Amino acid sequence: MNLTTQKRLAADILKVGVNRIWIDPERIDEVSRAITRDGVKQLIKDGAIKAKPKKGISSYRSKKIAQQKKKGRRRGPGSIKGAKGARRPKKDEWMTTIRALRKDLKEMRDNREINKSTYRKLYKMAKGGAFKSKSYMKTYARDHDMLR
């Protein structure tokens, strides 16, 4: 049974594409007899003809990728785009380092490992970028007899 006319009319009435028209398989004879717009409208009202929902974009793949990233996957060298300084700016690295150094210096001063003048000297050196880590700073202080 050819239902192209009915599908075309229904698509026009429902303002959807022809491929989104669904016809009840149990009422095909009834639908085939409807050859006017009014007949098709009546069938739509009765529920013999309906518009299928839009397909949309599946979120399965994006969810799967997000799950993998949560587990720490997809972080290999092939996934890295941008320079080293773009992924973690130099300023951020500097801030992390200097905060650690200053915190360590305060602890050393409060625990009386160093005196105020030594604290100030090491503080200024840290600010100038003389130490790249806490261990370097402690080694420097030990080697130059700055510790009490």
Swiss-Prot record:
Gene3D superfamilies: 1.10.1200.240, 1.10.1650.10. GO terms for biological process: translation. Residues 52-76 have a biased composition (Basic residues). Keywords: Ribonucleoprotein, Ribosomal protein, RNA-binding, rRNA-binding. Residues 52-95 are annotated as: Disordered. InterPro entries: 60S_ribosomal_eL19_sf, Ribosomal_eL19, Ribosomal_eL19_arc, Ribosomal_eL19_CS, Ribosomal_eL19_dom, Ribosomal_eL19_dom1. One of its GO terms (cellular component) is cytosolic large ribosomal subunit. NCBIfam families: PRK08570.1. This is Large ribosomal subunit protein eL19. It comes from Methanothermobacter thermautotrophicus (strain ATCC 29096 / DSM 1053 / JCM 10044 / NBRC 100330 / Delta H). The gene is rpl19e.
